[in-house]
Design a protein with these regions (language model features):
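Intrinsically disordered, low-complexity, charged terminal extensions of DNA damage-control enzymes
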Residues: 1-43, 49, 212-369
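Catalytic cores of DNA base-excision repair glycosylases
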Residues: 14-28, 32-33, 37-224, 228-237, ...
Length: 369
């Protein structure tokens, strides 16, 4: 097992305290003020009102890469439609994608369904209660396994996400790169050793909460409001703006695309993407690489000569993925005849009720009326 003492040796820094604390003492000194603060300041959130294992799991997956306020309505809609693992395991893929539409990172939803199938087959429809078993489910890493195990089952394991990495890095004045897996591993081991075993749920949620609303990123922490200020080395040293340290992200590839709203009466042409790759298996508005001129559209989208009634330019749009940035121009193409057979001819109301179109096309789907 990893020796958490390596962290303590590594983090010996110049103390500003009158009586210096050992690193493990500093972490233990957080516990009481953290728990007291959380009990008083915890936000009221729908998944906290009933912290059942399934609900905790769904909320934690949704909260990956997505803000709390944005998740709330999606969570309530999802739970209403798919209230348990049995419903999730049996839902049709298109229905699942529609429920997830707007949250992005659609592999999260696919992994939820895969995991639900395993829960039904191997665990009798009940969420596994132990960290190591949770870790075996698709889409669940150390953070999510720790969150579900501690919040839903009280297991004394840490849940270290980006918020916690930031808080602990500042408390310890650590200059370790928080994007390195090794940094996360030693932080997990250290917290596992020092966290209050009987209060694991509130401890983990409290750390996450402080990181979300007090110890915020980009050099703007609210130190005057922080219950950990008295033990925080970065605060004492005036280095909160420099911590945490993380590797600058790689530059995204720029990709130009042309998007078309193909219309005939109350119908719109859409396509289903390939089963693998970016936005796999989702529906999309017709689009091609490059920025095309109006006279190039018919050939690019396989439209017959004389099929176009009118072409109207639409506003430019941009969508950022983790590794690529789409810079789009758009056109509304009104057709004289029906939607070509190579496209799905969808009624406009079906775009709201049936087909899941990713946020990448949001600027243009809002213009369909």
């Amino acid at each position: 097992m990893y020796d958490a003492r390596q962290l303590y040796d590594h983090l010996q820094v110049a103390e500003q305290d009158e009586i210096p604390l050992r690193p493990d003492e500093r972490l233990r000194a957080m516990n009481r003020p953290l728990l007291a603060w959380y009990e008083e300041h915890a936000r009221i959130l729908p998944w906290r009102e009933e912290p059942q294992p399934y609900r905790v799991w769904i909320s934690e997956i949704m909260l990956q890469q997505t803000r709390v306020e944005a998740v709330k309505p999606y969570f309530e809609r999802f739970i209403k439609a798919l209230p348990d693992a049995a419903a999730l395991a049996s839902v049709e893929d298109d229905r699942l994608m529609k429920l997830w539409e707007g949250l992005g990172y659609y592999n999260r939803a696919r992994n939820l369904k895969k995991a639900a199938g395993i829960i039904m087959e191997q665990y009798g429809g009940r969420m596994p209660s132990e960290y190591e078993d949770l870790l075996k489910l698709p889409g669940i890493g150390s953070y999510t396994a720790g969150a579900v195990a501690s919040i839903a089952f009280g297991e004394p394991v840490p849940a270290v996400d980006g918020n916690v990495l930031r808080v602990i890095s500042r408390v310890m004045a650590s200059r370790e790169d928080i994007l390195k897996a090794s940094t996360k591993r030693w932080m997990e081991e250290c917290l596992k050793e020092t966290m209050p075993k009987e209060r694991a749920s509130h401890f983990n949620q409290g750390l996450i909460e402080i990181g979300a609303i007090v110890c915020v990123p980009n050099g703007q922490p609210k130190c005057a409001e922080c219950p950990l200020a008295s033990v925080c080395l970065a605060f004492k040293q005036g280095s909160t703006g420099e911590i945490p340290v993380k590797t600058p992200p790689k530059k995204r590839r720029i990709e130009e695309r042309t998007v078309c709203i193909l219309e005939h009466g109350d119908r719109v042409g859409i396509k289903k993407r390939e089963d693998s790759g970016l936005l796999a298996s989702l529906y999309e508005l017709p689009n091609v690489e490059g920025h095309l001129k109006p006279e190039e559209l018919a050939e690019a989208f396989g439209l017959l000569e004389g099929a176009v009634e009118k072409i109207t330019p639409l506003p430019e749009a941009k969508h950022i993925f983790s590794h690529v940035e789409w810079r789009m121009i758009g056109y509304r193409v009104q057709l004289k005849k029906s939607i070509p057979q190579e496209f799905i001819s969808a009624q406009k109301k079906e775009l709201e009720q049936v087909y899941a179109l990713p946020n990448a096309f949001g600027r243009y789907t809002k213009l369909i009326n």
